[in-house]
């Protein structure tokens, strides 16, 4: 109560922030006439002026009013769009590193230009993050004329783009791309073996569009670059036959072999189930008599069994995945989009492939990974935009330290949100949905129907076909057409069925999107200019009549066929209607067979239903029920937040380790001279080895000199008779032996360096170090995965799993670091080097970020001969000279990172340029 009184007196935090921003808006508006009076050249010159002022010590905040005024005027001249006052507020919110919640249709894409322009002036690069390649290309294409007018360059990162093009895109002042592309490029940059192969600059400032979708919905899914591991494909096929023989329990305490926890999305095998599974596997010959699934030798069998059970019990066709071109393609549960190239980890994808009888591809081994939570926290400044952030404001603040500011609409919202209608069965619910659609269609009111799965969208489509109602279906299977379908969803009587409207990125304009239609006419090369103008004029006249008719019919009507787990997703669907003060309406139709009600609100809601006891086909509308459902949604949101927070807490451990490894790797990559580091590593390794067999403060009887000599000979090719040293000098101790051994190793190493040359040795050292780090890090990631999967069992021993994970992960990391140093020292001191021995080992090209990536070269390949001769022979059979001198003589200019003119497809520096 006191809080409410304080808010009435002082206003909420949001009100106070808006009040401050409005003062800046007044200053920007005061500059408008001055900017309008400038010529194009004078307006463009402002960018250079701002950059100079920043170089002279002014801050971005200091030039904000002028920069925003310049951007607004440039937008009016180039795009024909002038920023509203509320859009100026949105721009300031983004610049301040906060989240701007703006309703659909309020022009978020235009809002971003203000903060992007201002921050790009600093010359450190700005990233604009979208949810898919289409939106990245579209938004960049729309805004590029504005940025180019202001003297700034624009780049776009899309999947399948080559590294050289990526470097150019990142070098631009402003770079558009998807969250996946930015994240995977960061990981790939930390796998290169040549610093010039890196594509990203420093992570300076990012504006994330649909920030809730990216930072919350996708936060539980880490980005993983993986290579194919050795795996027994046949085992997946065999294990796929086991689940049908096991009995599913109806309840957690019921009889059977396994229990499916739909809330936690897990399968739990009972004691009886373990015994039954062991019997089946023994009969199949996979398990020895009286052997246990829990024995160390059978961990892989248990892993495959649980993957098969999850595939059969939790993952359903046309809901969690579809089969396309003989492959299992994951469906994004939040947006309904196909996630081509993505694969589930831990053998689950292979288990689903076995279940559906498609080709089983090998399991992946993690080479590098990071969560979106930790990736986006690497930016110096982060901000975001969305239509629905307020329900997740606490999570944004606690995880990302991002405050949410609700931006007022330019015009008041006129949409009517009707109470939910709740039915006994799904059949009754869908009958009511079709009836509502039919009534809207008769009066010419466009309808958007939102479903939570492909299965339901196809069911609604089937019912509409039976009713003879023309409609469009927008789901993951129709990905290519979605922008066009959404653009025309506001036409008179249009019926659009959408899997999920989250992240669709295209406004629904009442009367249809005229721009899409006129653009199509302008792009039609079969029409003359006169014909194009005539058709566009006719379209514009017809559009106004359609627009007025839709307005009279009540605007866009939204129908939700199910409540989503998150209120935010429901609000996104509702928010498609009522843009820019347009009329509209929304209603959700629910049944007690819906997953949300069945799992989280069943008991009390069913009691209410029994009291009201309506006839078949009669809906219940009650505030108590609506509150009950919202309570269930809050419960799910809280559970999902806890899960995301838990993922972050565990990943934070790996993240600190990742930072250390990547920092060390970067230092090696960029240092011209790493001889001091190498000397330190050799000294540490020899000291540790001596301490192992001659422990400090120990008696001579406890020393194991023969084993020490054998290890030195085997690991370092160092044949020293330490026992004779001890006999010759009774006063000698462990420290003296360390010094002698280090001196011998350093002398031999100096001789090797002199033989091949200092620079050649430095290149060789650098590549060996990078490859050892990568190989050891890869093994460490696998070990961390295994630790993470089993750590929850520590709770049975009354131990805190998180604390145990941190403790063991720290020990494992110490072992990793010691192992890296040992392998580097061992390889570099024991390898036999001939004169002019080594061609620099280049990084293996990594494929599409969403496909299975090639593994890094192994150590045998690293220490082997250069493959350049093979490339030359294959792509240059006639022996043409492609050396720099020969190319220059022929007038050809080929840079190091350009494709080699021999046609091999490799970079010049990796092919014939290497020979030079």
Curated annotation (Swiss-Prot):
Signal sequence bounds: none
Role: Part of the Sec protein translocase complex. Interacts with the SecYEG preprotein conducting channel. Has a central role in coupling the hydrolysis of ATP to the transfer of proteins into and across the cell membrane, serving both as a receptor for the preprotein-SecB complex and as an ATP-driven molecular motor driving the stepwise translocation of polypeptide chains across the membrane.
Catalytic activity, EC: 7.4.2.8
NCBIfam families for the chain: PRK12904.1 (NF009538), secA (TIGR00963)
Subcellular location: Cell inner membrane; Cytoplasm
Coarse class of the protein's main subcellular location: membrane
One annotated GO biological process: protein transport by the Sec complex
Protein name as it appears in the record: Protein translocase subunit SecA
Entry similarity comment: Belongs to the SecA family.
Binding positions (ATP): 87, 105-109, 507
Cofactor: Zn(2+)
HAMAP family attached to this UniProt entry: SecA
GO cellular component terms, semicolon-separated: cell envelope Sec protein transport complex; cytosol; plasma membrane
Residues binding Zn(2+), per UniProt: 900, 902, 911-912
Reactions listed under catalytic activity: ATP + H2O + cellular proteinSide 1 = ADP + phosphate + cellular proteinSide 2
EC class: translocase
InterPro entries recorded: Helicase_ATP-bd, Helicase_C-like, P-loop_NTPase, SEC_C_motif, SecA, SecA_CS, SecA_DEAD, SecA_motor_DEAD
